[in-house]
Amino acid sequence: MAAGMMKDLEAFRKAQRADGPATILAIGTATPPNAVDQSSYPDYYFKITNSEHMTELKEKFRRMCDKSAIKKRYMYLTEEILKENPKVCEYMAPSLDARQDMVVVEVPRLGKEAAAKAIKEWGQPKSKITHVIFCTTSGVDMPGADYQLTKLLGLRPSVKRVMMYQQGCFAGGTVLRVAKDLAENNRGARVLVVCSEITAVTFRGPSDTHLDSMVGQALFGDGAAALIVGADPVPEVEKPCFELMWTAQTILPDSDGAIDGHLREVGLTFHLLKDVPGLISKNIEKSLVEAFQQFGISDWNQLFWIAHPGGPAILDQVEAKLNLDPKKLSATRQVLSDYGNMSSACVHFILDEMRKSSKEKGCSTTGEGLDVGVLFGFGPGLTVETVVLKSVPLLD
């Protein structure tokens, strides 16, 4: 009897799991309507924060913006909103309540906009969504943004939710890792993944004693990305664009304090050490070897690349360290140029850009004609997320 029960349990456990790997079935993105031109941003930023008397600092900030490789960003914070909330414009003024009032509404709202696009592309009824993963570094609330999104979209009350607050820029990889595990261990699961980021928590006036804060003011933008992740796609109905083959997370050695953020009365403060690009480029090959030796790949130019664009210096140093063909990071640099650093949402914007540009260029796969690729998330810790992706053939 015990043997029979064990056999039944094994069959039950096997029946719970999917047969194939997790796949990305749809991608949707959204930004606030307010677009900010990077070339004129220093003038606007110093004017709106009443800092025009700080002429040397303004020139330093202008150089930061010029070197950012960003042409445009999108921001929820308009001139009108900032004039109504002068404490948000000051450097280190108590302003958390005002910031929270903005983001607890706007983060799920922007997430809903991206999610609606992903659900439409997916083409299945939203009642088939079994899990929700919501990620944001913008504010904290209870019930969380996952709950608000569920209500806004009209998802089933029994949908299984995971909420990730305060993860930072590596979390675009984290959500894929968690979604993969959910999809592959729950047969028929369809996971709605949403990353929504609003810079209202980090915006503040300039300071000549906190230049790393100004780096953030020059780089960060607002955006939300949504994915549908599931295994065993329904033939002729669901159309995968990438497969999630393997994932890892690691803390880089000797990187304590390299990137950190603290939620205080003044909002979310960010601290960056100058050597962040060096730390990442020095350690990235180890992550690549760990990920790809099982696939027999050691030429990093054989891969398609999605790297979180923390800033141009990180991309430049990674490119140099690995002797990458400059075209490898073209999708990554395009998103940085068009949107800035949107924290966790960035890598999903890059996935979307890659599959679309691959189709436009007539490539044979969603991964620029290549079969296997890598997605990297870099963030506080210094934490690195690695995701091995398989592209999907593009049919004529």
Curated annotation (Swiss-Prot):
Where along the chain is the active site annotated? C169
One Pfam family assigned to this protein is Chal_sti_synt_C
The task this protein performs is described as:
The primary product of this enzyme is 4,2',4',6'-tetrahydroxychalcone (also termed naringenin-chalcone or chalcone) which can under specific conditions spontaneously isomerize into naringenin.
Q: Which UniProt keywords apply?
A: Acyltransferase, Flavonoid biosynthesis, Transferase
The answer, when asked if GTP-binding is one of the entry's keywords, is no
Q: What is this protein called?
A: Chalcone synthase
Q: Name one GO biological process term.
A: polyketide biosynthetic process
Recorded metabolic or biological pathway in which this protein acts: Secondary metabolite biosynthesis; flavonoid biosynthesis
GO molecular function terms here? Answer: naringenin-chalcone synthase activity
- Show the catalytic activity: (E)-4-coumaroyl-CoA + 3 malonyl-CoA + 3 H(+) = 2',4,4',6'-tetrahydroxychalcone + 3 CO2 + 4 CoA
UniProt EC number: 2.3.1.74
Can you name the source organism? Pinus sylvestris
Q: Tell me yes or no: is Acyltransferase among this UniProt entry's keywords.
A: yes
The record's comment on protein family reads: Belongs to the thiolase-like superfamily. Chalcone/stilbene synthases family.
**Record's superkingdom?**
Eukaryota
The gene for this chain is CHS
